[in-house]
């Protein structure tokens, strides 16, 4: 798959739609940042403190006790889940946009929560997270590979729901794994091609993200469209 063509297609689609794309992408990014900020900071501090306690006692066995890992989760977990759903809304909204449909501002922001998507998106997201975590216990690389295997899950859930098909907890995960067979490297390289844009965004104190988010999301939606076509839109 030619990534230059995917990016060019995204630029052409955004040419007369930057106002809509920037506004909806900016607001969703704010929501994601808001819901992720506290859990990330608190979670990091909690983990560091827990590990310090373990090292202080000299008992590494504590790392393998359920109580240790249970302590890493709390109220912030709910905020993380909500933040992830706004990320899923971003995926759904720009998939519709890549297909020529501009969702209204509010419908776009909450697209993962509406039209019957919430439960299947949540179940497949949760199962995908668990599977990826279990693979990561082996080594970092297997977990990374699985993250690319499951990368098309939210797109597939959207299409299955829109076509009226029944979506179980692992339906889209399995479909994504099959769809990405032989294409994980292509998506990895596509992601790498945005590194320059991310560096520029950091150097501009985040201003560059205003353009990067719609550009990247539209490009990835086109990647999915090229890969899946209307396969999951058919009953």
Q: Can you describe what each PLM-predicted range is?
A:
Residues 1-235:
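Hydrophobic alpha-helical membrane segments
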């Amino acid at each position: 798959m030619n990534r230059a063509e995917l990016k060019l297609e995204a630029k052409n689609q955004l040419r007369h739609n930057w106002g809509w794309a920037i506004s909806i992408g900016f607001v969703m990014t704010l929501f994601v940042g808001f819901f992720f900020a506290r859990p990330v900071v608190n979670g990091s501090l909690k983990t560091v403190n827990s590990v310090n306690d373990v090292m202080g006692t000299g008992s590494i066995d504590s790392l393998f006790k359920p109580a240790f890992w249970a302590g890493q989760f709390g109220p912030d977990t709910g905020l993380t889940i909500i933040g992830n759903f706004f990320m899923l809304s971003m995926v759904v909204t720009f998939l519709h946009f890549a297909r020529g449909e501009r969702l209204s501002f509010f419908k776009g922001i909450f697209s993962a929560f509406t039209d019957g998507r919430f439960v299947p998106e949540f179940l497949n997201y949760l199962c995908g997270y668990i599977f990826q975590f279990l693979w990561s216990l082996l080594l970092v690389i297997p977990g990374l590979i699985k993250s690319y295997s499951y990368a098309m899950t939210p797109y597939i859930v959207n299409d299955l729901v829109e076509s009226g098909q029944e979506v179980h907890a692992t339906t889209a995960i399995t479909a994504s794994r099959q769809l990405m067979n032989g294409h994980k490297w292509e998506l990895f390289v596509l992601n790498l091609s945005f590194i320059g844009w991310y560096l520029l965004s950091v150097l501009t104190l985040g201003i560059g993200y205003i353009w990067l988010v719609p550009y990247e999301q539209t490009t990835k939606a086109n990647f999915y469209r090229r890969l899946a076509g209307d396969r999951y839109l058919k009953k």
